């Protein structure tokens, strides 16, 4: 699952 984890981190960083 490459990209999914990165997307999750991006969402948390935006918060």
Curated annotation (Swiss-Prot):
> Which Gene Ontology BP annotations are present?
proteolysis
Kindly list the places in or outside the cell where this protein is found, as annotated in its UniProt entry. Secreted
Q: Report the GO molecular function annotations.
A: serine-type peptidase activity; toxin activity
The superkingdom of the source organism is: Eukaryota
Q: Where are the transmembrane segments?
A: none
Q: According to its record, what are the GO cellular component terms?
A: extracellular region
Its chief place of residence is secreted
User: What does UniProt note about where in the body, tissue by tissue, this protein is expressed?
Assistant: Expressed by the venom gland.
Keyword annotations? Hemostasis impairing toxin, Hydrolase, Platelet aggregation activating toxin, Protease, Secreted, Serine protease, Toxin
**The keyword Protease is annotated on this UniProt entry:** yes
Q: Per the entry, what modulates this protein's activity? A: Inactivated by p-APMSF, leupeptin, iodoacetamide, protein kinase C inhibitor, phosphatase inhibitor, ATP and PGE1. Is insensitive to acetylsalicylic acid, ADP scavenger system, protein kinase A inhibitor and hirudin.
Coiled coil (UniProt feature): none
What residue stretches are annotated with the Peptidase S1 domain?
1-15
Q: So what EC number does this one have? A: 3.4.21.-
The family classification in the record reads: Belongs to the peptidase S1 family. Snake venom subfamily.
What do we know about how this protein assembles, alone or with others? Dimer (it is unsure whether homo- or heterodimer).
Function, as annotated, reads: Snake venom serine protease that potently induces platelet aggregation. Its aggregatory activity is partially inhibited by monoclonal antibodies against GPIb and the thrombin receptor. Its ability to induce intracellular Ca(2+) release is blocked by pretreating platelets with thrombin. Hydrolyzes thrombin chromogenic substrate CBS 34.47, but shows very weak coagulant activity. Can hydrolyze fibrinogen alpha-chains.
Q: What is this protein called?
A: Snake venom serine protease IVa
- Per the UniProt record, the source organism is Cerastes cerastes
